[in-house]
Amino acid sequence: MLTLYGREVSSRLLLGTARYPSPAVLADAVRASNTDILTISLRREMAGAKKGGQFFELIRELDRHILPNTAGCHTAKEAVLTAKMAREVFRTDWIKLEVIGHHDTLQPDVFALVEAAKILCDEGFEVFPYTTDDLVVAEKLLEAGCRVLMPWCAPIGSAMGPLNLTALKSMRARFPEVPLIVDAGIGRPSHAVTVMELGYDAVLLNTAVAGAGDPVGMAEAFARAIEAGHQAYLSGPLEPRDMAVPSTPVIGTAVFS
């Protein structure tokens, strides 16, 4: 079980709800993934007006924990306002905090992120901050009151997979007791296995599933991959060696002269 802000969930896969071919495909992908947590962009869905209402009804029928996000916000003020609106709509203190600083890379504005995190934590929100793999920023977010960190492994939607394993390893080692969820950049189930083998607690996916040729099949593949990576981490995988090591014991081997 994974505990996030005192709430236990059985799945280590968090799933985004945007860009699926149809509501039916989204619903089937959610079920195939076995996820307990769905992320939702309040701004995007409210912009759809009538369709947004139909979407929210579908989400309610799926009966998962809702993690609203502040996608599309570029300032701390925008993010805080969106978070407050999401709290009213979804009746939850959970918020996935995104403050985007660059239009091309969608890299977080870490200065505004920390500012918004401090405000929201002080107002009783349970903040899931989308951040970089920078350890100093991570420290500042924890000092602001965050009890979960969500570092990227590559730019949002890039599907490149983990670009800086050293940084991800360092973050895991530096914060052994903090739930760490890789958010952004995952493209394949093998990428998810890689980060889970490092000891990360969960993976958040959206584009990798929604944009796949078969989103439902991909959701199931990721669910299996994340579980496999977590089990591998718990089982203690071998560390790489510079030299060959025989797998067959030498003792008892016949010697011919």
Curated annotation (Swiss-Prot):
- Predominantly, its location class is cytoplasm
Localization, per the record, is: Cytoplasm
The active site annotation covers: 96 (schiff-base intermediate with dxp)
Mind listing the UniProt keywords for this protein, alphabetically? Cytoplasm, Schiff base, Thiamine biosynthesis, Transferase
- Is Transferase tagged as a keyword? yes
GO biological process: one example: thiamine diphosphate biosynthetic process
| Catalytic activity, EC | 2.8.1.10
Q: Which reaction does it catalyse?
A: [ThiS sulfur-carrier protein]-C-terminal-Gly-aminoethanethioate + 2-iminoacetate + 1-deoxy-D-xylulose 5-phosphate = [ThiS sulfur-carrier protein]-C-terminal Gly-Gly + 2-[(2R,5Z)-2-carboxy-4-methylthiazol-5(2H)-ylidene]ethyl phosphate + 2 H2O + H(+)
Q: How does it assemble?
A: Homotetramer. Forms heterodimers with either ThiH or ThiS.
HAMAP family per UniProt: ThiG (MF_00443)
Please give the family membership noted in the entry.
Belongs to the ThiG family.
Which purpose does this protein serve, as stated in its record? Catalyzes the rearrangement of 1-deoxy-D-xylulose 5-phosphate (DXP) to produce the thiazole phosphate moiety of thiamine. Sulfur is provided by the thiocarboxylate moiety of the carrier protein ThiS. In vitro, sulfur can be provided by H(2)S.
UniProt protein name = Thiazole synthase
Instruction: Tell me which species this is from.
Output: Agrobacterium fabrum (strain C58 / ATCC 33970)
Gene from which the chain derives: thiG
